[in-house]
């Protein structure tokens, strides 16, 4: 294999680290962090205080170094740090399972490690469930613009793009339905929704393993938002055609969309739910797939072939479960933090709306986004996002635009003053473009 020797390697990059989603020859080196607290990140060189405007890839739900969650992990670590979950049960997993089952109305939980595996598990469960019932189904339906993770099954479900095109020949086919993205003052939303439902209904005439979607907001695809009414229509059509609905709540769960789970805004109950990111408050990696009891029962058999042969070394890790229980405590103690966040975004975003190249402003819960129509490329490879990111960091705000999509997704603990400053920085930068 030939190796690429960089002509002018950037010596500021660590010589042993391979950073995610990054081409180092045209990206700025990682900033060294000394510590974080609440909505702030502190860097070493340059010495700087940054507002974490995207919750460190959407995970730090309650901010950095939350004392309550840190204490819960510390006390659990002194009791039990890890145990094989195939043979042993521990209190933190029991408590977490009972709480999440009660909150989602789905009875069974399967633990894994992250968002991609939580989606992968949901897909495997759905596929094998039909097999266990004597049905061979191969069709899977997802939506245009979707991103469900980076393991092979999750990649196959996502939109074919720069993230996964190198592996296209290794991925199974998936049927696609248009995603009726909407925004403030969108006059064509119902037309787009009706078109999508018609296409979905036609596809579902063929026996289908499952339909998977990111309820209300497609994250990495560009913070593409839809109305709760559309999610409700999808659920109805899926149910009427005897298929399964998988809700990928890896991003949208735990208050991010203005309700504890995004599917609740649509007043539906999916057949399977994948959760991660905010699950542990951002402290530890953990994924969970929730399933209805009827699905679980399809695996109960004397036949070994009907067993769900899947597992992870750190399944239901006690430290992760303790962090997740502590995070749920905080959400239950002060739900107004996520219930009222949308109003804060709307009060600040009015000023940005006036700029001529700002388009498609949209807000759902704690997430606010808009498009910058500058340059020919309107997708992830539009360099305007990199320019805005670099300028924002200089001014004290960390954001990571998705190409020409600028968004804010801060921790729930961000102060009104910090949120106002975040919007002010973005407005100042955009005004000078």
Where are the model-predicted features located?
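Conserved N-terminal phosphate-binding loop of PLP-dependent enzymes in the Aspartate aminotransferase
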Residues: 1-433
